[in-house]
Amino acid sequence: MTALFTAPSVDEIIAKLGAQSTCDAGLTQDPWHFDTTTPSYGPGASMLDRLPANAPCQQVLPDEYRKASDEELQQRISDAKQRLGSKLLILGHFYQRDEIIKHADFVGDSFQLAKNATERPDADHIVFCGVHFMAETADILSTPEQSVTLPNLSAGCSMADMANIDQVQECWDQLGEICGTQPDSDGLQQIIPVTYMNSSAALKAFCGRNGGIVCTSSNAHAVLEWAFARGKRVLFFPDQHLGRNTARAMGIPLSEMPLWDPFKAQGGAADPADYARAKMILWKGFCSVHQRFTVEQVERARKAYPGVKVIVHPECSMQVVDAADGTGSTAYIVKEIANAPAGSAIAVGTEINLVNRLAAQYPDKTVFCLDPVVCPCSTMYRIHPAYLAWALENLEAGNVVNRITVDEDTAREAKVALERMLRVHP
C-alpha cells in the first residue's frame, strides 16, 4: 500500500532552505502601531522605499477594535457583512492575509478584481481589501452611486509611487523631442504609453488621453500586441521587469529596450538616440517583493528538492524568470499549482500570503516560497481584520469611512485606458 504523501509545513520548508530570520521584527507588531509613527511602507518588503510626502495616512483606529480578540473581530465582520447583505461587495486581492480573504465575495488578481468591480451595480458599497491603486480602479469602473472604501488608507504601493504624473509628463515631453510627435508614413504613432495596473489614476488618465492603455500581468502580452499595432514604440511604466520580460518573450531584443530613469537627465541614456531606436522604453521601477527573488534562491530550491518546478511572477528580474520553469500572473500561479499532480514540489516566486494559502490548500503537494527570508508586501499587510470590522460597522451606521474617489476628469480619461484593456482581454 502506497503511503499518503504529506507535505512539510512552511516552517519545515523554510528550515530546510536555511532561513534564519523573518524580513523584519516589526512584522510581529499589529499594523495600527504604524498609524502613529512616521509614515512609511514598512514593515515588509517595501520598508526601504521612499514614501511620497503626499501619501494618504490612516487615522488612529478606535480602542475597541485594537483591543478586540481575533475571534471577536471575525464575528463582528461576519455579522456586519450579513446585516449589510446585498448592499455590500467585498473584493480581496490574492496577497491579503487569510483572515481577510475568508470574508471576500471575490478573490483574484488586479485584473480579475477590476472586472468584478463592474459586476455588482446593485451593491451600494464596495470594500476593497487591497491597495490604493486597486481601490481607485474600482471607483473608476463602478457606478457613481457606489462608494469604494479602502479599510486602511496606508495600504499603498511602492511600485505605483515610483512614477508620478509630473515625472511621466516630463519624460513624454523629452521623448517627443527625441522621437518626434507626428505619426509615421504608415500612420503609426511615435510612442504608445502603456501603464501597468499598479499605477495611480492620474497615470491611467495620461494613457487614456494619449492613445495608450492599461495592462496587468495576466494580459501584458495581448496589450503590447495592441500597442505595437498602433505605435512604433512603447513607453512602459512603472515596472521595468514586467515590461522587459513580456517584450523579450515577444522577440524584442534587449538592445531595443533602454531604461528611463526619472532621476537622471534625459532618462540616463548615454546617447538619447537610444530612445529613438527603441521598441520598448522601460521606466526604472520595480516591485520590492518580487525584486527579492534571486537566481541563487532558484538554485537552492532545486538542490533541496530535486525535480522541483519553479514558477515566478513576471515582476521578477529577467534572470530569475530565465532560471524558472514558468512565469505568469498570480492567477497563472494559482492555476499551475491546482493542476500539478499530487506529490509535486513547486517553488513559487511571489508574495508569501498567497504561497502559504496555496500550501495549505494543497497539502498533497510541497508548495513553498523561493525567498527563505519570507517577506510580505508591506502595504497589503496593513489590511488587518480590525480595520475591516471598523469600516463595515461604520457603513452599517451610515458613515462611509476611507472613501476613495477619483475626480471626474481623471476618472473619465482613465476609464478610456481601462476600457481599452478590457476590450483587449475581455
Predicted feature residues:
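Active-site loop-to-helix "anion-binding N-cap" substructures in soluble metabolic enzymes
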Residues: T2-V348, L354-P426
